[in-house]
Amino acid sequence: MEVNILAFIATALFILVPTAFLLIIYVKTVSQSD
């Protein structure tokens, strides 16, 4: 079974980008609260 590298990269970005964005917002919020 051949893995489609572009599909894998697209899926990884689709998951990682929003996760990183939310993580940055969370860190900023915690920093401001402290």
UniProtKB/Swiss-Prot annotation:
Keywords in alphabetical order: Chloroplast, Membrane, Photosynthesis, Photosystem II, Plastid, Reaction center, Thylakoid, Transmembrane, Transmembrane helix
InterPro entries hit by this protein: PSII_PsbM (IPR007826), PSII_PsbM_sf (IPR037269)
Gene Ontology CC entries for this record: chloroplast thylakoid membrane; photosystem II
SUPFAM superfamilies: Photosystem II reaction center protein M, PsbM (SSF161033)
A Pfam family that the UniProt record links to this protein: PsbM
Its biological purpose: One of the components of the core complex of photosystem II (PSII). PSII is a light-driven water:plastoquinone oxidoreductase that uses light energy to abstract electrons from H(2)O, generating O(2) and a proton gradient subsequently used for ATP formation. It consists of a core antenna complex that captures photons, and an electron transfer chain that converts photonic excitation into a charge separation. This subunit is found at the monomer-monomer interface.
Topological type in the membrane: Single-pass membrane protein
Name under which the protein is recorded: Photosystem II reaction center protein M
Sequence similarity: Belongs to the PsbM family.
Organism placement in taxonomy: Eukaryota, Viridiplantae, Streptophyta, Embryophyta, Tracheophyta
Residues that span the membrane, as ranges: 5-25
Recorded superkingdom: Eukaryota
Cell compartment(s), UniProt: Plastid, Chloroplast thylakoid membrane
GO annotation, biological process: photosynthesis, light reaction
Subunit structure: PSII is composed of 1 copy each of membrane proteins PsbA, PsbB, PsbC, PsbD, PsbE, PsbF, PsbH, PsbI, PsbJ, PsbK, PsbL, PsbM, PsbT, PsbX, PsbY, PsbZ, Psb30/Ycf12, at least 3 peripheral proteins of the oxygen-evolving complex and a large number of cofactors. It forms dimeric complexes.
